[in-house]
Amino acid sequence: MGILFAHLLFKHRYIHGIDPLVNFLSFTFILPTIIIVLGIISIYGNSGYLNYILKIFDLNIYGILGIIIAHVLLNFPFVTRIIFQSLMDVSYDEWSLAKHNGLGGFALFKTIEWPAIKKIIPTVLTMVFILCFMSFAPVIIFGGGPNFSTLEISIYQALLFEYDFTKAINLAFIQIIICLIFLLIFLFQNKISFFTLSENRVLGTKKTYSIKYVSDYLLLLIFIIFAFSPLVAIVLEGIQSPKLLKIAFSKSFLIA
């Protein structure tokens, strides 16, 4: 998903609003995970806007499906951001040579874009693994039992339910070691600027809206709706809530 979305964003990078959209794709690193999880429940939960789609296929958000959706939503916008950056980092000379040789479509993707994407895949996979490995809220909310667990949840259970501090410390130590190993792998791989768009000059001309790109626009729209619908759902439910002002000025909220 990240590769396809990044490719489409890069292909239509001259459309107004694409740059702010790309910059906003880092939102999953800023927002608390619980907000995304609550947004997913608002969309796909038992009383969610799109729950009827899951019912058609006899699917339930509470289980492995919810865990997968949550982690896809938490990771694919950021992955898209990284891949888009790698495409922007391709030198002007490479784009110029490709255009001179008449490359386009799949040939251009295979010759220029794919090598740029391929070299950062190990870095992206390492980053996603670390984020999923340390996941807590999505697994404990959608998993709801011992069938789905992570080290984070095992530590939580050891402290809260078993009162076994030795076990919790041992699990935490194992988690630190594993994270350090993958962090070292990440640091020794290609350095990527996650939050700054490249200023490299990319060959191309500004494109106008065209009927031949309808399929691209539809895919972009689907990706955007999928990525941002949980946030929109949270905002809408918050605005419509009659208790919003009461909670906002409550003593517990002000203390927090």
Located regions from the model:
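Membrane-water interface segments at the C-terminal ends of transmembrane alpha-helices
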Residues: 1-88, 116-143, 168-187, 211-239, ...
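Glycine-rich helix-loop "coupling/hinge" segments at transmembrane-helix boundaries
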Residues: 42, 137-163
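Solenoid-repeat scaffolds in large eukaryotic assemblies
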Residues: 98, 167-168
